Amino acid sequence: MEVNVERLKELRRERVLSLRELEGKSGVSYNTIWRLEDGRQGAHPRTLRKLAEALGVAPSELIRGGGDTDG
């Protein structure tokens, strides 16, 4: 799945989490998170679910074109 890179970074920064801290909260490896944020790879649905849960959002918010931001 194509990750909304900017949204992932924004959510992590809003929660004042480093990549290592997000790794600890989500169980997703540092390298995977780094590659996702850098746009170097897509994500499996399970990975998106883990990241979304750690960030307190719906998985759809992390998918390009998946988050409803129109109010």
Please describe what each predicted stretch is:
Residues 6, 16-17, 43-46:
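Residue-level signal for the short linker/turn that defines the boundary of a DNA-recognition helix
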